[in-house]
Amino acid sequence: MTHALLHLKGRVSPDLEAQWMQQLEAVGQAHHWSELQVHQLQLVVEEWMENLLAHALAPNAGLQAILQLQDVDDELELTLSDSGQAFNPLTRPPPSLDLDLDQLQPGGWGLHFIRSLACGTHYERREDHNHLTLRFKK
């Protein structure tokens, strides 16, 4: 059974990110989730927003973001959508973890982190928006 928990929209900005962090915490408290569950969702949303701010947002572009959180049986399903250029983060190869620290290259670590927290991922480009869906065990 699916139960909608959050549906948030806004123009990408640091202020929007802070508002969404508070909303996630409030929903987590209302549903008695563990601090770890809430923190994981917040980290994922924070990383996604930071990537939008750093890579997808041209000055005054008005990039829109949408967060949907649903309770689906034994999982939480988080869908993050944006009106930026098409970008499938799931096709980017993970960074090499076999290198020494001084050999590691920048880039891709946030996406790797997001994928490592989720138990399932899906991406699609629909209606001029990127839609990244992540599933987490409750």
Regions found by a protein language model. Name each.
Residues M1-D15, R115-K138:
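Flexible, glycine-/charge-rich segments associated with ATP-binding catalytic modules
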Residues M1-L43:
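Bergerat-fold GHKL ATPase/HATPase_c domain
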Residues L36-N60:
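Conserved ATP-binding N-box helix of the HATPase_c
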Residues A61-Q70:
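A conserved short beta-strand within the histidine kinase catalytic ATPase domain
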Residues Q70-L78:
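Short beta-strand-loop-beta element adjacent to the nucleotide/active-site pocket used for signaling
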Residues L78-P106:
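Glycine-rich/acidic phosphate-handling loop/turn and adjacent ATP-lid/helix
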Residues Q103-A118:
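Glycine-rich phosphate-binding loop
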